[in-house]
Amino acid sequence: MSRGLGDVYKRQLLLGGTAITSRNLGFDADQLWTQVEDTRTTNIVIVGDAFAKPMLDALDRAADTNKPYDLSSVKVIISSGVMWSEEVKNGLLKHHDMQLMDTMGSTEGGMGSSVSTRDNPPKTAKFSLNPGVIVIADDGEILKPGSEKIGLIGTSGLVPVGYYKDEKKSAETFKEVNGVRYSFPGDYAKLEDDGTITLLGRGSNCINSAGEKIYPEEVEDCL
């Protein structure tokens, strides 16, 4: 279990809720929706399209056979870790009006989130920034909304001291900007006019083609 997923479960348990897990070693979307019906689950935690696509396929199959799953108890689906595409979010919302919470972060710190509903249509890789988060260009400029530049996302607040016995990686990731200590896990983004960001992906996974940078989220969105 990841630290982030553990935090979600701990929060529910501390509030008097119940944490429900699957006994299956693999992921079975039909089994998940059956369990949601049986237990009247309110919150579902997933990891992007890797889970959401088969979940949507299962809902579509059930609807096509006039045996739709009962989703009336579901209030929110929470995702983090990999891309959750606009197409799949819209598909889920057709079956049930709920909140789709897409969170962006890493072990080094939380950065942003987005919430989609039928009245607030989703956008792929669009996030509102958490307080204390900046986007900084490679030349050190702190970007403002509407900038044409692309920058690294940095988060302040509860920033780790460093990586154990890895001074080089620690110096690359944890830096001070104007006297404030930030964590820069390596994610690039563009800061839009409205103050939201479009996440482009991890710089270490970027592909250079004919002088242009192609980011992971751009490739995944096309696929």
Regions found by a protein language model. Give the residues of each.
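Short hydrophobic "strand-cap" motifs at the C-terminus of beta-strands
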Residues: G6, S22, V47-G48, S79-S80, ...
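Conserved AMP-binding/adenylation subdomain of ANL enzymes
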Residues: R3-V45, P54, A58-A63
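Short, intrinsically disordered, charge-balanced linker/junction segments flanking boundaries
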Residues: M1-L5, E220-L223
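Short Gly/Pro-enriched turn/cap motifs at secondary-structure boundaries
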Residues: P122-S128, T173, G179-V180
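AMP-binding/adenylate-forming catalytic core of the ANL superfamily
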Residues: I44, G105, S156, V161-G162, ...
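Glycine-centered loop/turn positions within well-structured domains
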Residues: R3, K53, G109, G151, ...
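Gly/Ser/Thr-rich phosphate-binding loop
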Residues: L14-G17, T41-I46, L56-P122, S128, ...
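Conserved beta-loop-beta connector loops within the AMP-binding
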Residues: I134-T155, T173, K190-D194
